[in-house]
Amino acid sequence: MAEVLKKTALPFLDAIPCSVAMAGFEPEVAGADPNERANILKERLTQPESSRYDYIILDCPPSLGFITLNALVAANSVLIPVQCEFFALEGLGQLVKTMERVRQRWNPGLKIEGILPTMYDKRNKLSTSVLEELKKHFPDEVFSCVIPRNVTLGEAPSHGKPAVLYDVLSKGAQSYMTLAKEILAYG
């Protein structure tokens, strides 16, 4: 883990960015013993250097491949971002089913930390409809905080910064700060 860990502009935050080194993880897992392949990431995260962190956040691709499976096996809980768009509901359904299989086979303590509606646009009927469906089907899991569609959230990564450092006063950055407070208050 130490070889891929990078310091960030925030002294209390380290990151393992996607890189060429990470690209090799999926084939490595695919080639591993079938009885061990789901636990590779969990084993790496239980190394002594990981113990110095209060939280380890795994940002997974929007697929249910080996990387996501390994993250679910290693995780205590899952924060699920859901774009307020139609197909996102189908993806959420698949993820929930996958989480149930992971609970049964490898990680009985895995829970949904919360479902985070993202890219919400109150002027768009579909956005509003998706948010209503989320609250209807997951009344206890949907965060109060909703992340709006926001230009800053799209621009910040191209400048190599998180939104809160790129433009802390933007609606998008403020929304993520509200989310952090909500997680800390209830987590």
Residue ranges and their predicted role:
Residues M1-G187:
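P-loop NTP-binding core
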